[in-house]
């Protein structure tokens, strides 16, 4: 309808008016398309008066926009940069996962991570192992504070119940224990939280120490019954070292919770975890029958096994806390 109306108006006009109307429309169309063409083409096809008029208009708006652009460029450059980076890297997400959040929360955020608590336990064991290497195996300060014995316990060094669980002398001993801690401890921490892993580690160390002292006390009582008393009995250099109790507690709890999961045994054979429970059972039977030569290590392991069974029973009944 609009096109028909325009045609009727155009036909109804006189010839001079029609000529002016066509010329005006052509100039407007050329002016609207002049910015799309190169400068030489626009100057070639557009009349000079149209070009000069458009240049004046363009100069007016360019001056206004240029001043605004300068203000934005020099006055608000930091705000524009901040807006750009905020769209790429949100401040909330970066703070929660970057170094800023770590600096604000400190060691609490680090210890709350599953891998962080495992790494911390490994570092603690490695530090005590280094102290044994530097100070020597015969250093009395290390023996009194990082080895559990009847002498250290009777002289009031109760902290050796826990510190002996971080103490290793042999390189093979610490490597095997830390491998088990990293493999099974990380899964326990992810399932129940890092605090639960710490509690389980300390409970395993305490359980192994209690079993060691109980066995030592029973052996002394039996010797007294047979009237065989060693000279200076309090200073008998029989002590407990190593994280066998904590590692056995963590390993066996993981096996009891996930018995059908397959894992690498001896870093070579992929076998079900339940086979590890069978191997631990044979070890305990040999120890009870007196066929195991290293009775002190087996007692430490037995303490960890008891702690794992108690923890597994509490988990099944829902009586555990993170």
Curated annotation (Swiss-Prot):
GO terms for biological process: proteolysis. The keyword Membrane applies. One of its GO terms (molecular function) is serine-type endopeptidase activity. Keywords: Chloroplast, Hydrolase, Membrane, Plastid, Protease, Transit peptide, Transmembrane, Transmembrane helix. Residues 1-52 form a transit peptide. The keyword Plastid applies. It is a multi-pass membrane protein. The chain crosses the membrane at residues 110-130, 166-186, 201-221, 238-258, 265-285, 295-315. One of its GO terms (cellular component) is chloroplast membrane. Its main location: plastid. It is found in: Plastid, Chloroplast membrane. Belongs to the peptidase S54 family. Rhomboid-type serine protease that catalyzes intramembrane proteolysis. May cleave the plastid translocon component Tic40. PANTHER family: RHOMBOID PROTEASE (PTHR43731), RHOMBOID-LIKE PROTEIN 16, CHLOROPLASTIC-RELATED (PTHR43731:SF33). This is Rhomboid-like protein 16, chloroplastic. It comes from Arabidopsis thaliana.
